[in-house]
Amino acid sequence: MIGIDEVDPAKLPTEISISALTLAELSSGPHAVSDDLERARRQDRIQRFEAEADVLAFESRCARAYGQVYAAVVATGRKARGNRSVDLMIAATAIVHELPLYTLNANDLHGLEDLIEIVDVSA
């Protein structure tokens, strides 16, 4: 949801699915601010978003697809561990559910173009 206000709504799908991993990342956001009003605003926004989205679990099929994702990234000479791991697990979830992956950070998914449709929604 970071940067979502800058995204052209025409670039976004009409039906929204979100990985449980993405939801976990988003859910930590309100706790990163010290201002109570801002924390409440962020929490409300996440809850409203979650109510409209289909949340996709990271399950065994996703774990197996992650192996393919990992190999594809390593084949490009990039590291597939550390901070990048969660993004790659999100990609594996999209692969299993045969969904395109909408992102503001398409470069983070370099090497996965043969496995998944990556939709760059950045300006």
Place the predicted regions along the sequence by residue:
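Active-site-proximal, substrate-binding regions of enzyme catalytic domains
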Residues: 37-55, 59-64
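Phosphate- and divalent-cation-binding pockets in alpha/beta enzyme and binding domains
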Residues: 25, 65, 111
